Amino acid sequence: PPPASWLTLRERHPNVDDYLTGPTLEQSALARLRAHDEDGLQQLLGDFHTWVTAHTVPRPSDAQQHPFLPVGTDEVLPGECIDAGFDNLVPDGTDLRLVDDEWWAEGGVDPDMATVRALWKLAWVTVESGTRHPWPATTSISQLTLILCGLYPRPLGPNPLERLYAAE
């Protein structure tokens, strides 16, 4: 039967052979932040951008609008990418692999919205964990999100936080 909502939680039973060793992209980003390594952080943001670009596809003709798929979105990330944050991506030697795909957004996800959400989640864990970073210790989650958006390899559109908060 079709899902009752645009967002569904799918039950997963991963095989232990599917687990990857090594740090998540988030762990690597936090290490770069602690080291005040902005160049290294920008490299990780570039790796994330490359992953997003590689997984972006044309919007399905039957995809219905939802908070993370606004009208006018021509390209999408697949539905399992709704939670594709730095905490859910692990390098596998040649690429980044999404290791937590239990959430599904029907019709896909706007790539910019998914990216802003991922950057907000990284800012949140940075601030909430007290991780040192190159900016003032009083930097808020919102401020750090905007800093990360500014370091991202390409513009993410106007008012990224307002769009994210409206979607959430």
Predicted regions and their residues:
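Conserved ATP-binding subdomain of kinase catalytic cores across diverse folds
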Residues: 1-65
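Intrinsically disordered or highly flexible coil/loop and linker segments, enriched in small
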Residues: 57-61, 90, 154-157
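Helical subdomain adjoining the active site within ATP-dependent kinase catalytic cores
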Residues: 122-168
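Intrinsically disordered, low-complexity segments enriched in charged and polar residues
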Residues: 39, 43, 66, 82, ...
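Short glycine-rich, low-complexity/disordered patches
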Residues: 43-77, 82, 130-143
